[in-house]
Amino acid sequence: MDRLMKKLGLLALCTGLSFAVHAVTPQAEAPAEQNVKIDSVVVTGARYASDIRHLPMTVSVVGREKIEQSLQPSLLPTLTEQVPGLFTTARGIMGYGVSDGAAGGISLRGLSGGSGRLMVLIDGHPQYMGLMGHPIADAYQSLMAERVEVLRGPASVLYGSNAMGGVVNIVTRGMREDGVKTYADIGYGSYNTLQTEATNRIRKGRFTSVVSGSYNRTDGHRADMGFEQYGGYAKLGYEISQAWNVRADVNVTHFNASQPGTVTNPMADADQRITRGMTSLSVENNYGRTSGALSLFYNWGRHRINDGYTVDPNDTNNPKDYRFNSRDDMMGVSWYQSARLFRGNRLTVGADYYRFGGEAWNRYVGGDRKGERSDIADKSQDEVAGYVDFRQDIGGWLTFDAGLRVDHHSHIGTEWIPQAGLSFHLPHTIELKASASKGFRYPTIREMYMFPPQNPDLKPERMWNYEVAYSQRLLGGRLTYGINLFYIDGENLIVAVPREGTTPLNMNTGKIDNAGVEAQAAYRISEAWSVAANYSYLHMENPVIAAPEHKLYTEAGFARGRWSVTTGVQYVAGLYTSVKANGRGTENTEDFVLWNLR
C-alpha cells in the first residue's frame, strides 16, 4: 500500500513548471459553434453525427478544454478522471511500455483492453496490435485529440470484435473558422521530466491542416525506469463541395521504455524500442437527409524487446541471449451511409473489411546461436462484416433503436450481433434510457498460435449487457446529472487452464457476472467557477486485476481569460492487485487517494 501511494503521489508532483504559448489570428466565431453544443453531438454511437439524447447507449465526452487543462502528454490519465467506470493502470511519472511489467491497461466495467475486450478507435478506425490484439497505450497522445468519446457498454454492432466492453474513440483535431492558430506547451519537473508539444492549425477557405509534434522524457523515480517518446501528427482536409469533403492523416510515434521489475525483485536490461504508426483516407458526404463516408486505414508497428533479467545473484534468470522482434499491421476499408427515409426515421447501413496480423521472431545476439533467427509466428487473418441500424422517433417523446451485425472471421466463422434500446424524452429535460446489447470478441493470433498456452480451436467470447440510464439538465443546462445501472452476463471467456504434467491450455471456460452503478454530476456556478464529480461501483462475481470496486473523482475549476486553475481528488478502493485463477492463489486489493492541482 505504501509503495502504491508513493508512486501515485509522484504523478501529482511530476510537473514542476509548465507554460503555454499561443499565437492566434482572431476571427469571428463560426455560426456552427454558436448554435451547437458540442458535447450533445457525438459520432461514436451511430457512425454519423447524432444527438446524444437519442442514443440508447451511454456516451461520455471529454472535450479539448479538459484535455489541455490536464497538462498530460497521454490521454489515459484524463479519461480515468473524467469517465465513471473507466480505469487505467500507471507505473510511474510518464510512459506505460509493453510486454511484462507494462502499465496502461484500460478497463471499463471490469472488461480490459489488455485482453482485447475494449477497443480504442481513432476517428472510428480500430487501433490495436495486429498479433496481440490489445491497444498500445503510449500511442494515444493528447496532441491529436479534439475530444474523446467513450461508449460505455458493448459497441459490437458498429465496430465488431474487441468492442465487447465498449470503445474509446479519439476524434482528431480540426479547424472550424478561417485563420491560423499555433499552440506550444513546455513542462519540466521532478526526475528530469520534460514534456513538450507544438501544434499549428490552419483553415483557408476550403482547405484545413493540422500539424503537431511532441517530445517527452523522464529518468523515472526508480533506477532503470527511463522513458523517452517523440512523435508527430498531420492532417489535411479539403471541402470539394458543400456536400463532399476529403481528409487524410498520419500519426507516427516512437518510444524507448525500460521496465525495472518490482521493488523486491528488480530487473536489469528490460528495455523496449517501439514504433507505432497509423494513416487514413476518408471521403465523406452530407446532403442533409443522407450522409455517409468511405474510409481506408492502415496501422503498423515495429517492436524490439529485451526481456531483461533479475539482478538477484541467487536467481538463475541470467541475461537473455536473444531479443524479441515483431512487425504487425492492420488495414481496413469501412463504408456507411445513413438516410432519413421519412419523418423521425434514420436508417444506417454499413460494411467493414479488416486484415490484420504480422510476424514475430527471436533474434539471438549471443551464445552458440548468435546471429540466428527463431520464428514464433507469421499469421494474417481477415474479418468482413455488414450491419444495419434503424432508429425511429415516436411523438417527440420516444426514440426506438435496433441494430444487427453479421461478422465473419476467416478462421473462426460467423457471428450475429443484435442490440435494441429505447430513449424516453420526458418533461423537465429528463432522459430515460433502457438497452440490451450483445458484445463479442474473436480470439487473437497470440491466444491461438503464439506461446504456450496457445490453442487454435478457440471460440469467440460472448456477453450481454443490460442497462438503464437516467439523466437531467437543470438551470438552463448549468446543472447536469445522471445515473446508470448495468448488468453484464458473459460466457466463453478465454482462460489458461492448468493441465497435469504439461503446460496450461487456453480454453473457453471463463464467465462474466458483473453489475454496477455509475453516476456523474456537473454544475457551472458562474462564468468563472465550476464543479464536477463522478462515481462508479462495480461488483464482479469473478474479479479481475486492475478493476476497482469503487472509483470517485471530484474537481473544482476557475477560469478567466487566459488563466485557469483546476484541482481534483481521485479516490480508488477495492483495486484488485491479485486474484484467484482456477481456484488457486489469493485475492488482494489496495486503496489510494490522488490529489492534483493544475
Feature names for model-found ranges:
Residues L118, H125-R152:
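Short acidic/polar hinge/loop motifs at secondary-structure boundaries
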